[in-house]
Design a protein with these regions (language model features):
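Short, hinge-like loop/turn segments at secondary-structure boundaries
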Residues: 44-48, 109-111
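NAD(P)+-binding Rossmann beta1-loop-alpha1 motif at the extreme N-terminus of oxidoreductases
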Residues: 1-45
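Active-site phosphate/pyrophosphate- and oxyanion-stabilizing loops and adjacent acidic/basic residues
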Residues: 41, 81, 118-121
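Rossmann-like NAD(P)-binding element
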Residues: 46-91, 98-104
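Rossmann-fold NAD(P)-binding glycine/threonine-rich loop
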Residues: 91, 96-130
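A generic structural signal for alpha->beta connector loops
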Residues: 23, 49-51, 89, 126-129
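Residues at secondary-structure transition points
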Residues: 6, 10, 34, 55-58, ...
C-alpha cells in the first residue's frame, strides 16, 4: 500500500493517480476526512480499476508500506511530528519543497537543517527518509 500524507493537493493527487494507474493500491490522507474521500473519488474516476481510499493522515501513515509526504513546507515539521509513531520503520518519500508564494512570486526558504529531507530524518529518526 502506498500512502500520501497531505494527498489532496495537486502533487499528492497526481502521484496517487500515477501509482493507481500502475496497479498499486493507494491511500490519500488529509487532516479532513471529507477532503480525503473527495480526492480518492476523483482519482478513482480517472483510474476505475484501481484501489483508492481516502483517510485521515494518521491512518494513511499507519497503512502505508511506502509513505509520500506532500504537504506545504509551512506544515512540514508539525505534520511529521504528529505522525512519528505511525511512520516508525517506514520508508518515507519526502517531496516537500521549501518555497513560499508571496505577491505572485515564489521565494525559496532556508531550511535550518540544510534540506527538507534532513529535517524529516531528524524528526523521524526511526524512519528511512528518501
Amino acid at each position: 500500500m502506498i500512502s500520501f500524507i497531505g494527498g489532496t493537493g495537486p502533487e499528492g493527487k497526481g502521484l496517487a493517480l500515477r501509482f493507481a494507474l500502475a496497479g498499486e493500491p493507494v491511500v490519500i490522507g488529509s487532516r479532513d476526512l471529507g477532503r480525503a474521500t473527495d480526492a480518492a473519488l476523483e482519482v478513482q474516476r480517472l483510474a476505475p480499476k484501481a484501489s483508492v481510499e481516502g483517510s485521515l493522515n494518521p491512518e494513511a501513515a499507519e497503512r502505508g508500506d511506502l509513505v509520500f509526504i506532500t504537504v506545504p513546507f509551512s506544515g512540514h515539521r508539525d505534520t511529521l511530528e504528529g505522525l512519528r509513531e505511525q511512520l516508525r520503520g517506514k520508508i518515507v518519500v519526502d517531496t516537500v519543497v521549501p518555497i513560499a508564494f508571496e505577491e505572485r512570486r515564489f521565494r525559496a526558504l532556508v531550511v535550518e537543517e540544510g534540506s527538507v529531507a534532513e529535517q524529516a530524518q531528524l524528526v523521524l529518526p526511526e524512519s528511512r527518509v528518501v
